[in-house]
Regions:
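Gly/Thr-rich phosphate-binding beta-strand-loop-beta motif of the actin/hexokinase/Hsp70
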Residues: 2-53, 86-89, 182-205
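Generic alpha-helix structural propensity
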Residues: 29, 47, 65-72, 105, ...
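Short active-site-proximal "capping" loops at secondary-structure junctions
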Residues: 32, 54-59, 93-95
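Short, glycine- and charge-enriched coil/turn segments that flank and shape catalytic ligand pockets
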Residues: 42, 58-69, 136-140, 182-188
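Switch/connector loops and helix/strand junctions flanking conserved nucleotide-binding motifs
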Residues: 44, 60-62, 95-99
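N-terminal phosphate-binding loop and adjacent alpha-helix
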Residues: 48-78
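Active-site charged/polar residues at nucleotide-handling catalytic sites that mediate phosphoryl
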Residues: 81
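Active-site neighborhood for divalent-cation/phosphate handling
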Residues: 85-184
Length: 205
């Protein structure tokens, strides 16, 4: 997860009653959607859900095509549902996603390996990208690496701030779906099919 939150909170998380509620938010070519979960004992339940259409041509294939129209839509959406903090799922089109192995690699050397892999797999200079990675839970040593152009993340961060949102994190849409739908105990290959209004995305996890 590409997080904009201060890393101290990862080490010393504040008490739950001090944490402002945050929603999950995603943007497609034609609409903005959010969902808010609530804990019920050991389970999570859907507390709220909302959706709003955005003007044609304002957003397409992961990019803002009409910035002012998109900002207006985001602002109206935030006010309509009284939203503020949000975890934002990023469309896959602007990302580079690949896997590599790190079995037997000391943890202190992981970053250097990641930078080598990014140089080999991403047609952008290292100083122009932001990346995140996930280690497999098993002993395979497999790493999943997600890379975005830094300019793309800055554009998203700017437009959401200007629209009144406080982005807490950015995450690839495919990763967000996998975390929501696939059990951590699942050790087989799973195909996730995300059917939208004008496109269908497939991902294998």
């Amino acid at each position: 997860m590409l997080s904009s939150a201060y890393p101290l909170f990862r080490i010393f998380p504040p008490p739950r009653f001090l944490i402002a509620p945050a929603v999950g938010l995603t943007v497609s070519d034609h609409s903005i959607r959010f969902a808010e979960l609530a804990r019920a004992g050991r389970f999570l339940t859907l507390e709220r859900f909302g959706e709003m259409d955005i003007p044609d041509g304002a957003f397409a294939r992961g990019r803002m095509k009409n910035r002012e129209a998109f900002k207006t839509a985001l602002s109206e959406f935030r006010k309509k549902y009284r939203l503020h903090e949000a975890h934002i799922a990023l469309p896959d089109e602007e990302s580079y996603l690949f896997h590599t192995k790190n079995k037997g690699l000391p943890r202190r050397d992981i970053r250097a390996r990641l930078l080598e892999e990014i140089e080999q797999n991403v047609p952008l200079p290292l100083n122009e990208v932001l990346f995140d990675y996930q280690l497999a839970r098993d002993e395979s040593g497999e790493m999943s690496i997600t890379v975005f152009p830094e300019k793309t993340i800055e554009e998203y961060l700017s437009i959401f701030h200007e629209s009144g949102f406080s982005p807490l994190s950015f995450e690839l849409e495919a990763h967000a779906l996998a975390r929501a739908l696939v059990s951590p105990r699942e050790d087989g290959a799973i195909m996730i099919i995300n059917i939208g209004k004008t496109r269908t995305d497939l991902s294998v996890v």
